Amino acid sequence: MQEGFHHVAFACRDPEATRHFYEDLLGFALTHTEVEGDEKARMKHLFFDVGDGSSMAFFYLEGPGFPSSYPTDISTGMGLPVWVNHVAFKADADRKRQIKATLSDAGVEPLMTVDHDWCQSLYYLDPNG
């Protein structure tokens, strides 16, 4: 029996900016952090509860053996518009208004809004593109 997914994972450029965006602005609790390695080379893995028993996770890699910088915006690396590959969260109208206001107060404006007839979407870029 299919039960959905446990987590999806993406790369991040700045774990603190990522935490701030998802925990402080969107309200997703940081539920688990794994750190492997040492001061020279390490991997940090952050898990955020997205509200249905699933998590969204981010890897931060630094040190020898890892690139000093890496693209985290999946779509543009494939020559596509930045909004093509994305994650969409469910929210009722009141929650959407609240999130839009919170993000706007933090200086984060939607990339675009789309009425798909069967759902309405607000597209934002997180700190990772």
Task: Give the ranges of each region predicted by the language model.
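N-terminal beta-strand motif that seeds the catalytic metal site of vicinal oxygen chelate
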Residues: 1-17, 84-87, 91
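Core segments of cupin and vicinal oxygen chelate
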Residues: 11-61
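Residues that flank catalytic or metal-binding motifs in active/ligand-binding sites
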Residues: 4, 44, 52-54, 83-85, ...
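Helix-adjacent hinge/juxtasegments
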Residues: 63-95, 99
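Short acidic (Asp/Glu) patches
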Residues: 41-42, 69-73, 107
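Vicinal oxygen chelate
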Residues: 100-129
